[in-house]
Amino acid sequence: MSLQRALQYLWDAEPHNTDHVTPLFCLGQVYDADTSLKEVNDDTEEDGIVVPLDTSNDTSWPPDFLADVQSRIWLSYRTGFPLIPKSDGSGTIHLGKLKNMIRGGGFDPRGYTSDVGWGCMIRTSQSLLANALLFRHLGRGWRWNKGDDFVYLSEGNTESRGGESRNGGANKEQETAVSEETAVSEETIISWFLDSPDSPFSIHKFVRHGEKACSTPAGDWFGPSAAGSSIYALCNEFPDSGLKVYYNGNGGGDVYEDELLETGFPLLVLCGLRLGIDNVNPIYWDSLRQMLSLPQSVGIAGGRPFTSHYFFGFQGEQLFYLDPHQPKPAVKTTDKDTTSFHSSRIWKLHLKEMDPSMLVGFYITSEADWETFKGSLTASKEKTSSQIVHIHPSRHNIPSFDEEDEYVSIGGASDDDFVDVTKRARKVAAMTGNTGSGRSSPSILDSHLVTETRDIIESVPPRKRVDNDLTSAPVDVPKPVQKRSQSHGDWEKVEEPEEEMVEVESMKGMQDNGCSAEYGSLVDRDAEADDSTLSTETTDRDWVV
């Protein structure tokens, strides 16, 4: 670990439990924030007088919640692993990548022996997948202890110790799915993620798929789309994982039920989302928290701008996450110690600081569990200001848009080619200028394109739906278009040629590989991963998270 990183780690003090009222959530389990403060009895007795226990200064986390957090598999930066060769045609290593190599423990002109500075999105995506596999093979009640032993909590034991499922039926489904399976241990699951070219879910395999299917060279940052595409492909290549994957490669929160049911169970459902321009639009905060409170949740790979985290829970408006930016030596395939894959450290991030690009995962055990999941989304529809996951009977059976529909789609099917606008979002956008969406927003964040995007959105009549075309196609824009004058705040009508069309750039080549254009923030690939300097120039830059 570099001196800078060590100082940052020490400076970033671990958050304490200062809210003893608001419940704590961890992947569908809810915990009383005050349970740790009542270890034996709520009261103490002094000279025959019952005195309430003073808990006002206690800042510890409830032990049941902490045990659940420690049991999550945590993938992070590693150093000293077998070489990941430079991508074909890459003759040089830029200064930014060279600095990351040195930070990661050394320089090798042939490629990378550490992912420090560029692998955080891969690590958080690995964490999401690893915990889905943990649920698949060991169940939701499994708990990790240091050493070779572990604790398994049945549903009843979980409730008695303070953790409750938001849906007991889903927990029973998960326990049934693993009741007869003991061959796959936690050690086995972690071995699938070790940093070796032979491990099925290693960083080497993620990078290989990113190069082949997503045009992401070794040493470059992944976005949610490349991460989701990699998980989908690698699980298909390794059926021994016992987990199938449904991933809508076009991005967004659209889930097509007929395709999902054909995939089979147990199933990991992945949704790549973008919920705003610079930050998550507040109208989606309730939906995000609801996603993490579902018993099917396996977390979110996302983060703050330029930095990816693995989000597993929340308390109020604070999200809990595991941070992959803690470099550790690579674990050898012969090492059975799994301690470095677990953490008792809890990080918090307010929803307003969260980057809008993310990969959301759900573990579905069976068709019955799928029906339960759908019911949970339906029940919460009236409680949340805007849904972020939309379930359709099929890709070709999406109802036409009217006043009651959730969204209107404009443009093509790739991540960067369309925006969805909810009725509430349209109102908020008119007041705040934030055109965040439930599916995707343009990745190019310069002011010119943001203005053009807003113009297109505002030009669509409320009762008109422009359907997505699965291939790239021009989209007619109603004329005249209302545009804001550059010189003053008044609205002026600009007559455009009647034949003018908005051209949607073809992304077919990337769609065929299940990997759409990445969405995120403009960063310099030659800079360090933690740098947060935006640039208005697009030369030799990429839009990534």
From Swiss-Prot:
Catalytic reactions on record: [protein]-C-terminal L-amino acid-glycyl-phosphatidylethanolamide + H2O = [protein]-C-terminal L-amino acid-glycine + a 1,2-diacyl-sn-glycero-3-phosphoethanolamine
Subcellular compartments: Cytoplasm; Nucleus; Preautophagosomal structure
A GO biological-process term: protein transport
Region of interest: Disordered: 156-181, 459-545
EC number(s) from the headed UniProt entry: 3.4.22.-
Gene: ATG4
Keyword Cytoplasm among UniProt keywords: yes
One MF term in the entry's GO annotations: protein-phosphatidylethanolamide deconjugating activity
GO cellular component, one term: cytoplasm
Active site: 120, 323, 325
Protein's recorded name: Probable cysteine protease ATG4
Matches recorded under PANTHER family: CYSTEINE PROTEASE (PTHR22624:SF49), CYSTEINE PROTEASE ATG4 (PTHR22624)
Pfam families (UniProt xref): Peptidase_C54
Species name: Yarrowia lipolytica (strain CLIB 122 / E 150) (Yeast)
UniProtKB keywords: Autophagy, Cytoplasm, Hydrolase, Nucleus, Protease, Protein transport, Thiol protease, Transport
UniProt record similarity statement: Belongs to the peptidase C54 family.
Function: Cysteine protease that plays a key role in cytoplasm to vacuole transport (Cvt) and autophagy by mediating both proteolytic activation and delipidation of ATG8. Required for selective autophagic degradation of the nucleus (nucleophagy) as well as for mitophagy which contributes to regulate mitochondrial quantity and quality by eliminating the mitochondria to a basal level to fulfill cellular energy requirements and preventing excess ROS production. The protease activity is required for proteolytic activation of ATG8: cleaves the C-terminal amino acid of ATG8 to reveal a C-terminal glycine.
Lineage: Eukaryota, Fungi, Dikarya, Ascomycota, Saccharomycotina
Domain of life: Eukaryota
